[in-house]
């Protein structure tokens, strides 16, 4: 954990593709913002359309580039979506500075597809990237 670090020890703390694998993601997120002015968090988006189709049609947990494990050997214990994460931030009064929607196969995407991914990230993005801060008193 981050208990050994004093408040405001860092400018930025980064957690890359690990949020879904920690025991208490909400507690860790708050601790990240205790030790740093801002946090950057990335995680696989469980609501991606391919995951939805796989689960809906095959009735099995999806395995993909973003989620490369079978259900029984995955380190992922708290899968979430863009909307889930944004709800968590709202519940804990965390300010979302930036949100980026990324597709692992984005290299071949047209500008139109990239725009669609930004407009419908919960459906079309494989990976979520957020930059967050503590909400400043108004």
Where would I find each of the regions flagged by the language model?
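A short SAM/SAH-binding and catalytic strip from SAM-dependent methyltransferases
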Residues: 11-24, 43-44
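S-adenosyl-L-methionine-dependent methyltransferase catalytic module, highlighting the catalytic core
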Residues: 27-31, 38-137
């Amino acid at each position: 954990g981050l208990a050994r670090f004093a408040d405001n020890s860092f400018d930025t703390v980064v957690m890359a593709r690990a949020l879904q694998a920690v025991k208490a993601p909400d507690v860790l997120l708050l601790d990240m913002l205790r030790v740093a002015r801002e946090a950057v968090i990335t995680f696989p988006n469980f609501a991606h359309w391919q995951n939805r189709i796989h689960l809906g049609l095959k009735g099995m947990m999806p395995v993909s580039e973003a989620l490369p494990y079978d259900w029984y050997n995955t380190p992922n214990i708290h899968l979430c979506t863009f909307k889930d994460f944004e709800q968590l931030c709202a519940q804990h009064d965390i300010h979302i500075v930036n949100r980026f929607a990324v597709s692992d196969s984005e290299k071949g995407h047209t500008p139109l597809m990239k725009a669609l991914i930004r407009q419908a990230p919960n459906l079309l993005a494989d990976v979520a990237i957020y930059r967050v801060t503590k909400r400043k008193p108004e």
